[in-house]
């Protein structure tokens, strides 16, 4: 739970897990520990040369080239969606990975022929205060000369502005997922999702105006809290708009 790297290191070294945010098989849950904020540690780039040295099949895995390879730019999600476990798994505190380390990891993969990247964050833009951080990363990707790439992410489409939309298109965003979950603003509020459906639609139009013409995956859920026949019909009206 939270940062897995120090936990794995302690397991390998046979050290105590007394202070770690984790469940241990065969032991009763420790009261309160699961809700503590994870310790923030700077994330360094994966060393793919080392990975290749201990896993000879790495290049075989990358040969097809028609898929996305995961790269993480941040951890944590500040939201309270009632159905989601990310706030338990990663914590609500957002921890940004250093931009230069993210780009260095992408450069290693790029030099190995990878052109598809999936940003594995719980949310690529978790809140409006992280818009500038997303811009900084995308500008760094451009400056690194990672041309011809395609990237994808799960985003909250209410956290966009025109400049960010333009950068997303220019750097190769080819696919994104948004979780509208319901076309009913009433049910969105009841699920504590914290966004306005009209703002989401306006942001999608903003991306289209910036030149985005690729794939969008819209996640809907049926039979959510207080679902009714009239609320089930609303997503299709939203899609038509």
Residue ranges and their predicted role:
Residues 164, 226-239:
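Catalytic cores of alpha/beta
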């Amino acid at each position: 739970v939270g940062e897995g790297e120090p936990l794995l290191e302690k397991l390998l070294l046979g050290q105590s897990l007394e202070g770690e945010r984790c469940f241990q098989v065969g032991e009763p849950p420790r009261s309160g520990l699961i809700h503590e904020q994870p310790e923030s540690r700077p994330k360094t780039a994966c060393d793919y040369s080392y990975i290749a040295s201990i896993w000879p099949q790495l290049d075989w895995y990358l040969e097809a080239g028609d898929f996305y390879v995961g790269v993480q730019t941040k951890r944590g999600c500040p939201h309270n969606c009632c159905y989601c476990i990310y706030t338990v798994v990663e914590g609500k505190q957002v921890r940004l990975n250093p931009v230069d380390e993210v780009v260095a990891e992408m450069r290693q993969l790029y030099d190995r022929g990878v052109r598809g990247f999936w940003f594995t964050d719980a949310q690529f833009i978790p809140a409006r205060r992280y818009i500038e951080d997303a811009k900084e990363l995308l500008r760094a990707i451009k400056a690194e000369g990672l041309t011809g790439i395609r990237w994808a992410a799960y985003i909250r489409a209410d956290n966009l502005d025109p400049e960010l939309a333009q950068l997303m298109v220019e750097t190769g965003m080819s696919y994104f997922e948004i979780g509208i979950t319901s076309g009913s603003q009433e049910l969105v509020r009841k699920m504590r999702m914290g966004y306005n459906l009209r703002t989401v639609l306006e942001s999608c139009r903003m991306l289209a105006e910036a030149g985005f013409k690729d794939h969008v995956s819209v996640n809907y859920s049926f039979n959510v809290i207080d679902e009714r026949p009239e609320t089930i019909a609303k997503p299709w009206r939203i899609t038509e708009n």
